[in-house]
Amino acid sequence: MQALIVIAHHDPDSLTHALAREVAAGLASAGHGSEIADLAHEGFDPRFTLADHAVHRGLAAPTADVLREQARIDRADALVLVYPIYWWSLPALLKGWVDRVFSNGWAFDYQDGVVTKKLRAMKVHLVGVAGADNGIFERHGYGAAMRVQIEHGIFDYCGAEVLSSNLLDDSEGPNAALHLRTARALGEQLFMPAHRQIA
């Protein structure tokens, strides 16, 4: 099995990148493959342009960079997003990737007021890296808001199934080693049947 691991962080020495490497290592140890899409290093342009708007309206085909990203996703058996949480949401680079890549005609069809979900086979795993602790997320409703926005608003809208959503909190505190172990375990268990996964 093959996973596409998408990273949206500008610093290759960040915890976010280290977590993505651990997910990949866990996958490899379980006999699976992975491809890492380092959006910052690859120079992906997250800006939604007039060309993207034309795609959304069904007036043009996606640009070459978007088609490449869609092909990467199509080749994968699972999609893993590893990202820092900025202002209680996805960073702009990753949000722009979603805006441009999950386009009308590929991720969904919208015609005459009817949405057809086209990514029903997609399995998604989310790894959000937060500086704040989980208590702040829950006390202010940020965790619930992110789940609605990302899991329901993006992936469910396209028919994709979010199999795991990990909030690795207090990332600037003493939990880095624990977070790395969590990421490794996620990779090891990514393609394991749910009833066999270790809690």
What do the predicted segments below correspond to?
Residues R75, A92-G96, F102-A199:
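FMN-binding flavodoxin-like domain, especially the glycine-rich phosphate-binding loop
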Residues M1-W106, D170-A199:
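N-terminal beta1-alpha1-beta2 submodule of the flavodoxin-like/Rossmannoid cofactor-binding fold
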